[in-house]
Amino acid sequence: MLGAALRRCAVAATAWAGPRGLLHSAPTPGPAAAIHSVRCYSHGSSETDEEFDARWVTXFNKPDIDAWELRKGINTLVTYDLVPEPKIIDAALRACRRLNDFASTVRILEAVKDKAGPHKEIYPYVIQELRPTLNELGISTPEELGLDKV
């Protein structure tokens, strides 16, 4: 599928080339103009929110997850343009606890606060939803540790 998309992009790119291989600022009308409308992006299936959440919860709930996989998962999750659901964060915090990685728990909570951005109501909601887990695992929030004042 990727090969076909790359071929379409190559065809679209050659449609702009003139007789000497130079790029022209405006295409000439004709059959090549139809090729121009091809967009070069993936047409793969999209993942529902429930599938996305289940995939991340399953990954963090792996009993044999190691520190590298945990950090890789956290880094990947942070790159998305979203604030993870509390159930995903819960699974990540439990994975941190299984690995005795307190620093990652603080990093996760700081990342959630950062991802919430100007929406001040999101972070308190997430902490409220995670409060039972935080108490059960003995995890302090960055605010409780005084890290928000640094």
Swiss-Prot record:
Belongs to the cytochrome c oxidase subunit 5A family. It is found in: Mitochondrion inner membrane. The keyword Mitochondrion applies. The modification N6-acetyllysine is found at K87, K113. It is a peripheral membrane protein. The keyword Transit peptide applies. GO terms for biological process: mitochondrial electron transport, cytochrome c to oxygen. Component of the cytochrome c oxidase (complex IV, CIV), a multisubunit enzyme composed of 14 subunits. The complex is composed of a catalytic core of 3 subunits MT-CO1, MT-CO2 and MT-CO3, encoded in the mitochondrial DNA, and 11 supernumerary subunits COX4I, COX5A, COX5B, COX6A, COX6B, COX6C, COX7A, COX7B, COX7C, COX8 and NDUFA4, which are encoded in the nuclear genome. Component of the cytochrome c oxidase, the last enzyme in the mitochondrial electron transport chain which drives oxidative phosphorylation. The respiratory chain contains 3 multisubunit complexes succinate dehydrogenase (complex II, CII), ubiquinol-cytochrome c oxidoreductase (cytochrome b-c1 complex, complex III, CIII) and cytochrome c oxidase (complex IV, CIV), that cooperate to transfer electrons derived from NADH and succinate to molecular oxygen, creating an electrochemical gradient over the inner membrane that drives transmembrane transport and the ATP synthase. The modification Phosphothreonine is found at T141. It comes from the Eukaryota. One of its GO terms (cellular component) is mitochondrial inner membrane. Its main location: mitochondrion. This is Cytochrome c oxidase subunit 5A, mitochondrial. Residues 1-41 form a transit peptide. It comes from Saimiri sciureus. Pfam families: COX5A (PF02284). A motif (SIFI-degron) lies at residues 2-17. InterPro entries: Cyt_c_oxidase_su5A/6, Cyt_c_oxidase_su5A/6_sf. Pathway: Energy metabolism; oxidative phosphorylation. In response to mitochondrial stress, the precursor protein is ubiquitinated by the SIFI complex in the cytoplasm before mitochondrial import, leading to its degradation. Within the SIFI complex, UBR4 initiates ubiquitin chain that are further elongated or branched by KCMF1. GO terms for molecular function: metal ion binding. Keywords: Acetylation, Heme, Iron, Membrane, Metal-binding, Mitochondrion, Mitochondrion inner membrane, Phosphoprotein, Transit peptide, Ubl conjugation.
